[in-house]
Amino acid sequence: MSHRKYEAPRHGHLGFLPRKRAASIRGRVKAFPKDDKSKPVALTSFLGYKAGMTTIVRDLDRPGSKFHKREIVEAVSVVDTPPMVVVGVVGYIETPRGLRSLTTVWAEHLSDEIKRRFYKNWYKSKKKAFTKYSAKYAQDGAAIERELARIKKYASVVRVLAHTQVRKTPLVQKKAHLAEIQLNGGSVSEKVDWAREHFEKTVSVDSVFEQNEMIDVIAVTKGHGFEGVTHRWGTKKLPRKTHRGLRKVACIGAWHPAHVMWTVARAGQNGYHHRTSINHKVYRIGKGGDEGNAATEFDRTKKTITPMGGFVHYGAVNNDFVMVKGSIPGTRKRVVTLRKSLYTSTSRRALEEVNLKWIDTASKFGKGRFQTPAEKHAFMGTLKKDL
């Protein structure tokens, strides 16, 4: 420790304390984009499931850069986004202490995958959730229309209740994820009418986001359990001959105050934290029924976004998907929340038009030599297992 500096930056950021396990596995949207009444009514966020990552090649369109008009290789994340089902609408009124919920109106029919969300043990339950509520529709629906009229009259913020269709994914889970999504654009009356028209109907991801848009990804990070202080906070390892361990903090504070300060790095829970990763550029929004949703103008090969053998620990992506630049929080199969950006980005990276030249669909488990089964068959010929 010779030539030790008297000052050094602290290790680890204090802005994300406490570093504890998230209360819910679903990413919570704590702020929505500012409403613009001149635009048409639309959702501001969407739920999907992280499938995995792959590689793309594109030409950089950035005048002045030494890589302008040259090929670059980038990592992208693929989010499986089956259409969401709208099942309710919530009205909020403004108070001196913030927004307060006015009332909630649910749809008449709810699927079993969303009813499971209201039970801890579905098989032992009587499965009578919302039976009394749906009876209001049988009684000419006057009570429902009164609640919708209250929202139109008093509410200033309108949000819809929508759930995922988890049965369309490779996940074993049967319980859908429910989210409250704010409606932006149009008047309050138009928002309520939009929500009422979409009751029990699906909304696709391409109606929320578009290509080249900058979005935010909200999710719970990958958990690592109880970790030591060196890995958790990035503190420096002590010299080799240190007594009773090297991966520790040598001094955890002064004699007085006679307690350990909250700013001192300590061992504890690492990972499984709620995080918001901002400014991910949308490279592609693919359709699930398109057998060539991974083809480009440069690569005309008819192939899907699912790599050979499927995404590792996930499987095949047969629904609509969103491809965003870089890595996103969470592990595979984890539900992630995609949200419109809270502000308009004016950087060159945000305004750049992205045209993909090639998408890697080789196996993510082995060497990844072939892009399609047809290419493998043409090279290997007929194998003994195929006879």
UniProtKB/Swiss-Prot annotation:
Q: Name one GO cellular component term.
A: cytosolic large ribosomal subunit
Q: Where in the cell is it found?
A: Cytoplasm
Top-level division of the source organism's lineage = Eukaryota
> Which GO MF terms does the UniProt record name?
RNA binding; structural constituent of ribosome
Q: From its record, what is one biological process in GO terms?
A: translational elongation
Where does this protein chiefly localize?
cytoplasm
Under InterPro entries, the record lists:
L3_arc_euk, Ribosomal_L3_dom_3_arc_sf, Ribosomal_uL3, Ribosomal_uL3_CS, Transl_B-barrel_sf
Q: Which Pfam families match?
A: Ribosomal_L3
Kindly state which keywords UniProt assigns to this record, in alphabetical order. Cytoplasm, Ribonucleoprotein, Ribosomal protein
Report the sequence similarity comment from the record. Answer: Belongs to the universal ribosomal protein uL3 family.
Q: PANTHER family of this UniProt entry?
A: 60S RIBOSOMAL PROTEIN L3-RELATED, LARGE RIBOSOMAL SUBUNIT PROTEIN UL3
State the protein's name. Large ribosomal subunit protein uL3
* The species this protein was found in: Eremothecium gossypii (strain ATCC 10895 / CBS 109.51 / FGSC 9923 / NRRL Y-1056) (Yeast)
